[in-house]
């Protein structure tokens, strides 16, 4: 075969002709040469593209890792800012310094990272270049915030005189909290322009193209608008919230409430006045926060809203109780109140026999509680000379009982009248006439236990929020009346243990008072007034009106528009059968009458739950179950109609006769002298009709019993793990 060059040189024309013929044939049978070239080009480009994509992927991973490092540093920045803010909030300059050092260090490290030459290549891509520039702007904002906000704020806290390495407890309303509030107020006044400057820079910050970086700053983009929304309130805060609060906290810190073994009432009034002063501002800012559009983006704002809700609620309570406290404390004059502990084991219509009585006195502005003593040493049996009895009182509450003995005043469920009788009797045998009477049943002691914690009695028994009343009203009697060595002394011992418990709880409540315990006490009193566990009476008309407005009076129903059915029960005998009384009242559906009144069926079940074993024990220890009646409850029961209404159609499954009369313009049915034997239930049914035009279903007011505490047991003691 000849070489191609030789062929060409010998017959060039022939070769050209063949070539032309070949091209014609190829045109008829195969794709064009250009298309063949395109396919090759595609293959080459694809190969090259794959190489480029591989390179880009490698670079992307590399720079993605670098970007993630920036994101991690950004998270560290946020953590430092949060730590600094928390330290400043708690008045801890030392922790704030440490957080700022960490913040500045992280910012510097990020700047060095952004200046690294490795970023030169990706900078040729516009979005990456823009993100790197935006990251630098973020660091500018961080550095500016550190320089013109955080560092001046830290210096202000340090210069305030607060301990530099300790947190201020913002809940104790003490002098240090007041000092910190002064700092807050000055900072808001002085740093508002700097804050505006930082917010403007943040508002002008471009968005990141890299998603993970934008995610790190996205929620903070709302801060400028949020600050603008609250700008007016922020500027109001120093003079309408912080400085007024600081004035009170530094002048009358809440921890100065306890003074000379008593309560400094000027501190109480100061904080109530403060509540009235700052309440409008707190209401405004609370409303603004709850109506804001950023709650989902800022969990801190949710916490603040919840905190302000609590504060607003506290201030409402302070405002609510202020008239009562002013009436109780007065204008600096001396006051004295009886504090009566009604014994539910010896059940009476108003609560119980007044087994223990203490005093609350206010002298030179200091409130002190005297020790509880047995009623026999405090309230005489004879009535005060000012007490005169109506015919209905004699009929309902018995001449040989209520009328004859001042200590039996609780046979009348109308607490203002009962308290008036006790106060008059006390005044008869003492030089001082009480300004009022405060009534407590044992229930309140157990309700206070979550605030005070457990107490241990002199006999070694520990009482807590789960086991207290059942011991004092039930178990203690079996412990002492059932032991021969306490014969003749059991009654005095059990009464003294009850008084000891009351004194211990009172001491713990008053020994280290703070706002939380004070508000907790108010809440317990408010709840306990609803079921007649806590009641008050004052001889001063203005004070009594404040008590009535709060619902603390224990008075019988007097408002036809708020109808109330009264069911009250007494055991007319000396015994401790109260724990076995179950009193249930059910009000059925009402029926509209032609005259616009509503009639309701009512059923009352009265049970004696004493079992045979207890009865046997009681027979051997007569005072528990009544020596004379051996477990049978000698009963007196009252059914009061709602104000402006009527009561009728009495029936009883045990054929107990119910009579009718009136008391203070209220219709009342009553039955007395009947017995409820152990294990027996007596059912009364009747109807009540409300005043015309009153559609509200009547509520039930009744004597508080011990049913809810029945059979509660001591909390198991943890074993010593040594």
Predicted regions and their residues:
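Acidic, low-complexity/disordered segments
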Residues: 716-719
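Alpha-helical transmembrane segments and their juxtamembrane interface "caps"
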Residues: 50-53
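N-terminal targeting leaders characterized by basic, low-complexity, disordered sequences
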Residues: 1-33
